[in-house]
């Protein structure tokens, strides 16, 4: 597959065209950002680690029938992915109280929820990604009613799978974000896109409560690189050069 021109560069990834108009190359960067780009830095080998972690997770999800944009891993930090039209909505799944939920409601971080909480956020950096309702998404045309139902159903299935997966390696899945898109070759087909990695998940060690995710960068806790590497190690992934 031939890599073509750069089509888009975001905070953590770059998308390149290929010789197939319906396929893209997704390149994972080492750049780290927080608070919608206000805080910036670099985490050594983050792109490689996130690419490998996300690839492993998406392969697991594909095996149980969750459609994703991933086709294959091309190199440690590059994936071949299906071209999609990303919906301007992030789905956040919460299993415990943390982050903005703790701040908004004044509930102690780490409090276990009676059931997974599904939240929607409008993807807009200028507005700081505000939380929105299902009605907002439908009224403003961000997603169709059927797509919203599919996103909720898929997200809860993904949650069931990932809770068990991470528990088996001693990690609590606290919360995480998901992004979905419409396949370019079949716009009626919704697939999981973007990535699932320590960049977009809160992952706590089950025994110690140690944070193994980007909160270490957000909160200046140190050991960011080591935390990402630890997640990869527990997943049995070999990071080149390590």
UniProtKB/Swiss-Prot annotation:
Matching NCBIfam families: purC (TIGR00081)
Name of the protein this chain belongs to: Phosphoribosylaminoimidazole-succinocarboxamide synthase
PROSITE patterns: SAICAR_SYNTHETASE_1
Alphabetical list of InterPro entries matching this protein: SAICAR_synt/ADE2_N, SAICAR_synt_PurC, SAICAR_synth, SAICAR_synthetase, SAICAR_synthetase_CS
Gene Ontology MF annotations: ATP binding; phosphoribosylaminoimidazolesuccinocarboxamide synthase activity
Catalysis: reaction(s): 5-amino-1-(5-phospho-D-ribosyl)imidazole-4-carboxylate + L-aspartate + ATP = (2S)-2-[5-amino-1-(5-phospho-beta-D-ribosyl)imidazole-4-carboxamido]succinate + ADP + phosphate + 2 H(+)
Keyword Ligase: yes
GO biological process, one term: cobalamin biosynthetic process
Known pathway: Purine metabolism; IMP biosynthesis via de novo pathway; 5-amino-1-(5-phospho-D-ribosyl)imidazole-4-carboxamide from 5-amino-1-(5-phospho-D-ribosyl)imidazole-4-carboxylate: step 1/2
Species of the source: Magnetococcus marinus (strain ATCC BAA-1437 / JCM 17883 / MC-1)
Family: Belongs to the SAICAR synthetase family.
Broadest EC class assigned to this enzyme: ligase
A cellular component annotation (GO) from this entry: cytosol
Keywords: ATP-binding, Ligase, Nucleotide-binding, Purine biosynthesis
Gene: purC
EC code(s) of this entry: 6.3.2.6
């Amino acid at each position: 597959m031939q890599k073509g021109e750069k089509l888009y560069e975001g905070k953590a990834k770059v998308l390149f065209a290929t010789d197939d108009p319906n396929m893209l190359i997704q390149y994972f960067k080492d750049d780290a950002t927080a608070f919608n780009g206000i805080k910036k830095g670099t985490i050594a080998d983050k792109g490689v680690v996130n690419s490998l972690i996300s690839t492993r997770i998406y392969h697991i999800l594909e095996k149980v029938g969750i459609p994703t944009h991933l086709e294959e891993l091309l190199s440690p930090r590059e994936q071949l992915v299906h071209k999609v039209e990303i919906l301007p909505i992030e789905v956040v799944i919460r299993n415990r109280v943390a982050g903005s939920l703790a701040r908004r409601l004044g509930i102690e971080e780490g409090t276990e929820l009676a059931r997974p909480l599904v939240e929607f956020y409008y993807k807009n950096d200028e507005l700081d990604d505000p939380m929105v309702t299902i009605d907002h998404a439908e009224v403003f045309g961000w997603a169709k009613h059927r797509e919203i139902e599919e996103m909720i159903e898929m997200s809860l299935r993904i949650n069931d799978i990932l809770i068990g997966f991470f528990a088996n390696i001693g990690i609590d899945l606290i919360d995480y974000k998901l992004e979905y898109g419409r396949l370019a070759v079949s716009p009626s087909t919704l697939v999981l896109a973007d990535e699932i990695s320590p960049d977009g998940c809160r992952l706590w060690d089950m025994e110690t409560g140690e944070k193994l995710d980007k909160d270490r960068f957000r909160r200046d806790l140190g050991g960011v690189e080591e935390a990402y590497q630890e997640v990869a190690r527990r997943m049995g992934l070999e990071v080149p050069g390590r």
